[in-house]
């Protein structure tokens, strides 16, 4: 039994195999190639697992789940945080030929119900330390409402569902049965900020290539010691090159529960971490922590800081080498496929001011206008892409696929970009972030980047607010070091030489900005704040 999904046309699949992108290997190969190694694969608090131990634990769990009736071709819903059991579970399910959805630990009732409704899982794996599963009320209701669930395993459980017991029970003559390499390996989550994230089917072939090529570009080796402080289940942390890239290279993943400086700085020093990945808000927190007295000596081993998940302003980018003392690599990718990196030997100009260029020669990327017509080089428009690791359709979502893809199979991500003569991409924002003020279009990220130049501004987010006369006006939400008045903000922006219509109509200074589950500023919530105040 195989999971239905939108496949690549045969001529594309043949070309990707001929060029060596697709090598018909299951993702389990990332781990099993090191199965005899006693090198440390994962550090989780005081626990350390070698590659041999990680592989054996995955075999044990897979064998236990098979005994409980879980079969190839079925699906699983998994919600685990930044713990070693996430990787044990991931590889165990791949070995069984079971395709999981890896829900983020921050997801709640609505998201879990939506995922379960879409994939009809046979298996649920969760953690008693999550508020939803701390008791049995939600669990019982969830399993009743989603009757496809036959098996439940819970981390930190003392009863019949104990995941740790299943992991510790020795495997008996276990033989892996991964799904074929051109079938669905697992589901990633769309990074969209509106509604429940859509499900993205990723095959072994396309995802393995993405990991393998990322490892080559980022030069991960057995000496790589990677701090995973962003959500480990997120695509960025899994494959760019992420933890899977570390495992492929034979390096070590060090897990952190969150990206706070107070937690991460000591871990970097203790485990001699040499690479990590952050989202821009976390970069700001690290820089602020150093200003406030955290010792930079703790970061002496850190050689490379990847930043992605949202566009990094040039202002912040320029501070990283000088203040953190390591090389910056910008990452612009999407769970749907396409990944762009600045290269390690790029000029400072490219690293600071662009988001890199595609990692595969067969990544087809162009810029379209609102009607889908190609735009000249350098102009800002909608990103269109297809390639050997960019999917061809969301799972069970024909209506959305009809608008997300053009007739030639190019995916429209909703990102607004420009491409320079050398192929480097600069992200200008999102279509939905464009504010239409009386017919004048304002790209929110342009104003946000200018606001971040102000010495008193730590974070900035520009959102639209409804206006009876203009249709929309703009509101700037700021997290500041010292009080700022709207008149001061507008004066500063005027000094940057921008048009008057781009000046924020309203300025709100707040203690913090709300974030989505993947660490991006939650502009939907900011707009809701405005709407609630307007109706009060």
UniProtKB/Swiss-Prot annotation:
Name of the protein in question: Enterobactin synthase component E
GO molecular function ontology, one term from the record: acyltransferase activity
CDD domains found in the cross-reference section: 23DHB-AMP_lg
Reaction catalysed by this enzyme: 3 2,3-dihydroxybenzoate + 3 L-serine + 6 ATP = enterobactin + 6 AMP + 6 diphosphate + 4 H(+); 2,3-dihydroxybenzoate + holo-[ACP] + ATP = 2,3-dihydroxybenzoyl-[ACP] + AMP + diphosphate; 2,3-dihydroxybenzoyl-5'-AMP + holo-[ACP] = 2,3-dihydroxybenzoyl-[ACP] + AMP + H(+)
EC number: 6.3.2.14, 6.2.1.71
GO cellular component: cytosol; membrane
Species annotation: Escherichia coli (strain K12)
One Pfam family, short name: AMP-binding
Residue positions binding substrate: 235, 240, 309, 331, 335, 415, 432, 441
Major localization listed first in the record, in broad terms: membrane
Localization terms from the record: Membrane
Ranges where the record places region Phosphopantetheine binding: 438-439
Biological role stated in the UniProt entry: Involved in the biosynthesis of the siderophore enterobactin (enterochelin), which is a macrocyclic trimeric lactone of N-(2,3-dihydroxybenzoyl)-serine. The serine trilactone serves as a scaffolding for the three catechol functionalities that provide hexadentate coordination for the tightly ligated iron(2+) atoms. EntE processes via a two-step adenylation-ligation reaction (bi-uni-uni-bi ping-pong mechanism).
Parts forming coiled coils: none
Alphabetical list of PROSITE patterns matching this protein: AMP_BINDING (PS00455)
Effect on the protein upon substituting residue 473 to D: Catalyzes the adenylation reaction with same activity as the wild-type. 3% reduction of activity compared to the wild-type
GO biological process, one term: enterobactin biosynthetic process
Xref: InterPro entries: AMP-bd_C, AMP-bd_C_sf, AMP-binding_CS, AMP-dep_synth/lig_dom, ANL_N_sf, ATP-dep_AMP-bd_enzyme, DHB_AMP_lig
